[in-house]
């Protein structure tokens, strides 16, 4: 049966995440002084990371939280994407919802019906994916620290907003280098060799 934000049937409640429902809090949540961008306040390095429910996904988060807290729900199955980000997305929702119920992992490499049935028949303990979750946390926090601190630093130095990121800035640099190489290209004569063989 389709309900608002989930499906129910055969002893299961099935719901979904819409991207990252829970995200790292902005600097001003840690301290109001960070509302104003100042080089004197850099670097911003949280001692205890804080998370907020994304404004655009509050409704779906609320649905997930209620489902997790239902008294007839004994355990949770993490069926998010099989990868680092899927692990992070689920666990942040689970933690932010204050859920303490046991959870297992459905790991799929195919969306075919047989593969899904096989996956449910062999659910994995959540602890098998702790390292994947920790890797995702490291990536997320590194992105935040580089993005927040470098963007604020270079925006202050430049005098207007300038976005800097762990991935986007090196890619932009490679694009600029390639564009400069194309602009500086000078055509040169070249020769090809033809070889005619006779038996």
Feature annotation, model-predicted:
Residues 1-140, 144, 170:
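Intrinsically disordered, low-complexity regulatory segments
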């Amino acid at each position: 049966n389709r309900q608002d934000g989930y499906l129910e049937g055969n002893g299961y409640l099935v719901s979904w995440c819409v991207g990252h429902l829970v995200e790292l809090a902005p600097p001003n949540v840690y301290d109001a002084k960070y509302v104003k961008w100042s080089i004197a306040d850099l670097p911003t390095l949280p001692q205890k990371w804080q998370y907020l429910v994304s404004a655009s996904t509050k409704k779906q988060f609320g649905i997930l939280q209620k489902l997790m807290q239902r008294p007839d729900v004994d355990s949770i199955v993490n069926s998010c994407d099989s990868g680092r980000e899927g692990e992070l997305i689920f666990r942040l929702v689970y933690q932010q919802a204050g859920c303490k119920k046991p959870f297992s992992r459905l790991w799929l490499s195919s969306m075919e019906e047989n593969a899904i049935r096989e996956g449910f028949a062999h659910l994995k303990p959540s602890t098998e994916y702790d390292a994947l979750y920790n890797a995702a946390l490291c990536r997320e926090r590194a992105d935040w620290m580089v993005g927040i601190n470098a963007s604020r630093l270079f925006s202050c130095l430049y005098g207007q907003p300038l976005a800097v990121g762990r991935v986007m800035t090196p890619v932009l640099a490679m694009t600029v280098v390639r564009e400069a190489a194309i602009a500086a290209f000078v055509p040169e004569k070249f020769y090809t060799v033809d070889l005619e063989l006779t038996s």
